[in-house]
Amino acid sequence: MRLPATLLAPLLVLLLLGAQLAQAADAVEWLNRANKAARQLNYTGTYVYRHGEHEEVLRVSHRLDGKQELQKIEVLDGPHREFIRINDDIYCHLADGKTVRVDKRTAQRFFPAVVPNNPARLDLYYIPKLGGIEKVAGRDCQIVILEPRDRYRYAQSIWVDRATRLPLKSQVVNERGIAVSTFMFSEIEIGKRPDRALFDVRMAGKRAQAAGERMGALDDVWQITPPPGYVRILESMRPLPGIRIPVLHSVYSDGMSNLSVFIEPILDSDDSGLEGLSTGGAMSVYARRVEGHKVTALGEVPPAALLETANSVQKK
């Protein structure tokens, strides 16, 4: 029996929609497993981080001891820096060799932990879909693509190891199809537990520096409204190079994309520096003055996200 054309078109639309929903569910399941693999597997590897015209080579070691998650990141080129994460506490050995910056109870995570704890929520702001299969570090990977649903975030792709579900590559691509940043393993060993001594925080003879005083009172003074989907994950007062007084710093995230807002008083002797929008390199930056303060928004996000966030800032 042949269906009338008036019924055939809606049926085809329903079939297409069903296929899209099924593929989105498959993509989210890959992301769920990628999130767990990055937190639960033991692995050691070397990866490259490319952002704009810059490139860094880093080594990561990850170990799970019962309920204790240990991670070490070492920068292999340029001045030596290393980060040790013990659950939610991060210890950063600075390049001067004398200082360890300590950041307690932070939400910050390092590659390959690029997938948030609730990937299903990403469907509100991205269209998840499966791409092809490519090799990374000699291993077959399933590509998971996150296409933005609006102008406030860039497209992202994650290459997930088909055997272990560990993310081996991630990439942010702007609206022109140009890679903004890329993390990619060049070599990786999965399954072997790194030695526990690798994660010892060596404080002898070094000065501890708090990464920033946590505030919790930003809403009492400032009103900031980021784009839909972005929620505040960090708020602190922290010192910054070249600035004499601590700066209010808040970070907003949708789970994949992050943007930062800095608020600092403009002193009489200051020339306020950058104002307006700058989009050169991997980071976009937007700065403006608000009631005697300089507000700066920056991140690997579209300019629209920075403008909407910074232009919303006002004193209560």
Outline where the language-model segments fall.
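An acidic-aromatic
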Residues: 54-113, 169-186, 190-192
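N-terminal leader/targeting segments and the immediate start of mature chains
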Residues: 2-3, 14-15, 20-69, 77-79, ...
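Short, solvent-exposed coil/turn segments at beta-strand boundaries
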Residues: 38-40, 62-71, 84-89, 139, ...
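Gly/Pro-enriched, hydrophobic low-complexity segments
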Residues: 135-205
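Intrinsically disordered, low-complexity linker/loop segments enriched in Gly/Pro
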Residues: 106-156
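Short, solvent-exposed recognition patches
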Residues: 205-293, 304-305
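Short, hydrophobic/aromatic-rich segments at coil-to-beta transitions
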Residues: 40-46, 67-72, 138-145, 166-169, ...
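Short, surface-exposed coil-to-beta transition loops
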Residues: 55-59, 152-156, 168, 180-182, ...
